[in-house]
């Protein structure tokens, strides 16, 4: 199964140690093993559905609600999937930065900035941690206009993440 640990916080976690000008052919989001591997094939995280490294759709959807307005920061909703959140506004991606174990994104979502970090703790000096099938999605929200805002972040995983072919049944 997939364990998705989502955390909120503040601090240097959201600021990469190094910046690069890499324009990658795809961006790693979740990389547990060859079978559990989710990537963004688009330069903008919300321009296409997320995919397995083979190109097969493995949809994740990320939405941030700011003062009652929804902004999609990850994935692209397709009508037949019937996501629980409907929205019209795509967040504006300001940056993406890929490092060996982390991918950093920053988005403008109306009056707030959203920082999202995808972390794969695949460090060879800690084999216990490396053997755990866990990746992390962390985020922080910062006010761009120095005012307080009501914010809610949600991440949704679609059934395409759990099956090999579209005709396979998913038990809930």
Summary of predicted features, one role per range:
Residues 13-172:
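Accessory carbohydrate-recognition regions in carbohydrate-active enzymes
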